[in-house]
Amino acid sequence: MFTESDYEKLHQIMAESPEKEELLTRLLHSHHMDISTISHEIRNPLTLIYSTLQMIEASNPEVLNIRHWSDLHSDIEYMKQLLEELSAYNNGQRLSPSSTDFDIFLKKISLSFASSIIETDIEFISRIEPELPVMPADSIKLREVLLNLLGNARDAVLIQQSSCSNHLDSACNCESNRFLNPGKALTYSPQIHFHAWKEHSNLIISVSDNGCGIAPEHLSSIFEPFVTYKSSGTGLGLPLSRRIIEAHGGTLTVHSEPNLPDCQLKTTFTLTIPIP
């Protein structure tokens, strides 16, 4: 699978001559078709396997007590998720833009995410500045990007909260695994900030959190396909997010300082989308 740097090099070569552009355009189209075909061919037998498992369970309920039987379901669900995300990544640059009022659009996303964490201790701070643009955008794909970033922030603060709860006699910093102020009562308060504003001719959207942060050695690779440092996940969420933002002519960047105190925001993802 091509990485983002591969695509950049291909586009540089395509700019050299019309002949190279035509040849590489056909190559990229064939590459997209191959991935779509492979995903389709795998998905069909996978669906059949899942149906067979359900039939076995219905006629032989005792199999539910077999060790690792439930792992079969988990593995199948993971493969289905992988195929769905692979297909989404393959089509990440294909947009269906429509007129989007970003004030309304972002407030809906903010409310949707806030309702999903209502039973947690997470403090969610949303700041949507006035005079955001109304402009063409693929709102469905942008929604996926923003909810993915917010979901990652939620995971990061919950990991940090869990790490701190395991050390009730000290305040902690999970990335460095160092513990500060021994003997002091733990006061970790998980926070996620969602901020959108207009700056010159750009729409800027940021998602920040005071979770466990991202190790410096991982920052350069988190946007590469299939790279993940989570116990679960396919490693396609961030690459797909960047691909969608770049298809809008924008950028998606990250800044993280995992060794900051827990009261400070450690990781920020920033989307910059040009306003036509």
Give the positions of each predicted feature.
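Short conserved segment of the HATPase_c
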Residues: 214-225
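Short alpha-helical Gxxx[C/S/T] motif in the catalytic ATP-binding
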Residues: 237, 241
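Conserved signal-transmission helix
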Residues: 1-30
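Detector for a conserved hydrophobic position within an alpha-helical segment of the HATPase_c
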Residues: 245-246
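Conserved catalytic submotifs in the C-terminal HATPase_c
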Residues: 118, 123-133
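Conserved DHp (HisKA) dimerization/phosphotransfer helix of two-component histidine kinases, i.e.
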Residues: 2, 66-116
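Conserved glycine-rich
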Residues: 250, 254-257
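Short beta-strand/loop element within the Bergerat-fold HATPase_c
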Residues: 164-201
